A protein has these predicted regions:
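Short hydrophobic/aromatic helix or loop-helix immediately within or flanking a transmembrane segment
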Residues: 140-143, 158-186
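Short acidic/glycine- and proline-prone juxtamembrane loop motifs at membrane-interface regions
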Residues: 240-248
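Transmembrane-helix motifs of polytopic, lipid-linked glycan transferases
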Residues: 193-216, 254, 481-485
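Start-transfer (signal-anchor) and selected internal transmembrane alpha helices
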Residues: 1-122, 321-331, 552-553
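Membrane-interface anchor segments at the N-terminal boundary of transmembrane helices
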Residues: 55-58, 68-81, 189, 193, ...
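Transmembrane-helix signature of polytopic, membrane-embedded enzymes
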Residues: 209-231, 495-498
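Membrane-proximal stem/loop segments at transmembrane-domain junctions that anchor or position
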Residues: 151-152, 343-448
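Membrane-interface transmembrane helices that cradle and orient dolichyl/undecaprenyl
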Residues: 217, 255-274
Length: 554
């Protein structure tokens, strides 16, 4: 009897344990499915936002003359139609496959990059000119810093007190000019030397873009991305103006590439090294072009959601310690790098007044200016300069921001939003020649026929420029057409895809809120191109499925 009772109790305990285990397994499956659904929800949100955003942009393209560029030969509406026809022709004849040999890729990439650099040098040598606005200020600041001219530094102190965001660019450029002086000035034109250095950076960005693009599209499309990049960015007129726009191109794509490498590597030591590098590049990029940090912010957001899901579904002490280690490495690296850069900025020699520095309120105030449609305005700058106290200036600018929004009303805000979007994203030449005193000083023509042709092709007031502008605008419109199709997939977005989507959307939102200018998009063109070719691949897949379905119906 005793044995029977013990056996019965044992069986009941075993059954109870089995029930508990089944319940536990069921709970874990439900929790896992919920986590999976949450991950799917994030993908759906990003896809939907991308579609809505770029459909809005394409509606602006089709509106007509309200948002037309002045230098192109064909209307945006006609380019939109021609772009669709051109893509259909491309699909019909795009049958060639490119070999995947890494050696062939690297050799081809090196040769292509060398050819691009030679073309860039020819363009820079023949068309370089002196412009005004911030480019001129940075150039003179770097020049005076390189030769140690105290009077020149004193004269430029007011500008850099107002715009301290350009100080690190002066550090970089003045270092290059100092090296040129130490070598006996092999380059007598310092602006030419800086433009060449910038061209090299843009060239490196193209190499990184190709390597990065292979993680999102086929090798064949990665080559096409590189080719389009070479046209839109590599041989753009902006390469001859050494400034943060050209220097900043490398940072968004480099941040994305390093993030991909972090996710691909298996060794913890290697991963820590990449995290350290990512943190350094994020800080350097911020001091060269502040909004490049949007990519880094996107990485932080996506990785935070990833870690949170892992901790909920499969908590472990090791996982938590790994996360804390990565955070500590990143934070310490960024603090050290930030301290070093601030020290270098102070060492230049400008007499800076911190109370004169314009904060984010100033750029938000510009962003809601109806007169300039969110662009630079002399009156806004004069208003900001009239205050010597930072706190008072920020307060008055916030008051003016509220007043402008109230005066616009809902209809006015919508109109401003549309105008800013068209101004920011519909110009494939990125505002070339639109800034005040853009062609301030044009150097004497080189003694060759090519110089005359290139200047006519690039200078906005010459005869051939309209053809250059039209070609670039046409290519850019095709890019805009393709981007929404990047969302046309049933697959859940991978982490690197989420970062790409979020970074582009975040950047576009940034320009819609703060000061707008088409040339700001120049920095993010590599990310736009990847999205466009992802969309192209998705569209091609959808069309193939459609025609396959039609043939089966017959």
């Amino acid at each position: 009897m005793f044995l029977f009772i013990c056996n019965t109790n044992y069986n009941m305990a075993a059954q109870g344990k089995a029930v508990v285990n089944k319940c536990g397994e069921k709970y874990m499956k439900i929790e896992y499915q919920e986590n999976k659904n949450r991950q799917g929800i994030l993908s759906v949100i990003l896809k939907s936002l991308l579609i809505v955003t770029f459909l809005f942009i394409e509606i602006l393209l089709l509106i007509g003359s309200v948002f037309e560029g002045k230098s192109v030969l064909v209307s945006n509406r006609m380019m939109f139609i021609l772009g669709i026809i051109g893509y259909c022709i491309y699909l019909a004849f795009n049958r060639k496959k490119i070999p995947r040999s890494v050696i062939v890729e690297n050799v081809g990439l090196a040769v292509s990059s060398l050819i691009l650099l030679v073309v860039q040098l020819i363009i820079i040598y023949n068309i370089i000119f002196q412009t005004s606005w911030d480019v001129e200020a940075v150039w003179y600041g770097a020049h005076w810093a390189a030769i140690g001219d105290k009077l020149g530094l004193e004269q430029m102190s007011e500008y850099f007190s107002l715009c301290p965001n350009n100080l690190f660019l002066v550090v970089i450029f003045s270092s290059i000019l100092k090296l040129n002086n130490m070598l006996g000035e092999p380059f007598s034109n310092g602006g030419l030397l800086l433009a060449i250095f910038q061209a090299i950076m843009i060239n490196l960005a193209g190499l990184i873009l190709f390597k990065c693009a292979k993680r999102f599209v086929t090798v064949a499309n990665a080559w096409k991305i590189y080719f389009v990049y070479s046209i839109l960015v590599g041989i753009s007129g902006w390469i001859v103006l050494p400034y943060s726009d050209g220097m900043g191109v490398i940072f968004p794509i480099l941040l994305l590439y390093i993030y991909i490498r972090i996710r691909e590597c298996n060794g913890e030591v290697q991963r820590c090294g990449y995290i350290l590098l990512l943190s350094v590049i994020a800080v350097v990029g911020y001091y060269v072009k502040p909004y490049t940090s949007i990519v880094f912010i996107a990485i932080i957001v996506i990785e935070t959601t990833n870690w949170w899901k892992k901790l909920i579904s499969n908590y472990s002490r090791t996982m938590l310690l790994t996360m804390m280690r990565n955070i500590v490495i990143g934070v310490i690296t960024m603090v050290v790098c930030n301290t070093l850069i601030l020290g270098m900025n102070r060492s230049v020699g400008f007499d800076l007044d911190k109370e004169r520095a314009m904060g984010w309120q100033h750029y938000l105030m510009i962003g809601v200016n109806v007169e300039s449609w969110g662009g630079y305005n002399d009156a806004d700058l004069a208003f900001a300069k009239s205050f010597n106290d930072k706190e008072i200036r920020n307060k008055r600018e916030m008051q003016l921001i509220v007043e402008r929004i109230q005066n616009m009303g809902v209809k006015g805000c919508a109109e401003l939003f549309a105008h800013k979007a068209s101004k920011n994203f519909l110009d494939g030449n990125w505002g070339w020649g639109t800034d005040k005193s853009f062609y301030k000083e044009i150097y004497p023509s080189r003694s060759n026929g090519l110089c005359t042709y290139l200047r006519s092709w690039y200078y906005g007031f010459e005869n051939l420029y309209c053809y250059n502008a039209t070609i670039r605008q046409f290519i850019w419109i095709i890019v805009l057409i393709m981007i929404p199709f990047a969302s046309f997939t049933l697959k859940t977005l991978q982490s690197e895809q989420k970062v790409l989507f979020l970074a582009v959307l975040g950047f576009m939102l940034y320009l819609q809120i703060f000061e707008s200018h088409a040339r700001y998009v120049f920095v993010f063109v590599p990310l736009f191109l990847i999205l466009a070719f992802v969309g192209s691949e998705n569209l091609k897949t959808l069309l193939n499925l459609f025609f396959q379905y039609k043939s089966e119906q017959k």
